[in-house]
Amino acid sequence: MQKLAEAIAAAVSAGQDKDWGKMGTSIVGIVENGITVLGKIFGF
């Protein structure tokens, strides 16, 4: 869950800095960590 929060914070920070490459990478991290969290919740 902490990694998901860190990825969201990184995406927000990148958006504020207009660093689009880092923002794209952070969004991928959000999706990846979100899937991991859902997998743990549903037992995948």
Swiss-Prot record:
Keyword Transcription: no
GO cellular component terms attached to this protein's record: extracellular region
Coiled-coil segments on the chain, per record: none
Residues bearing PTM N-formylmethionine: 1
The protein, known as: Antibacterial protein 1
Family recorded in the similarity comment: Belongs to the staphylococcal hemolytic protein family.
GO biological process annotation, one example: killing of cells of another organism
Function: Has hemolytic activity and also inhibits the growth of gonococci.
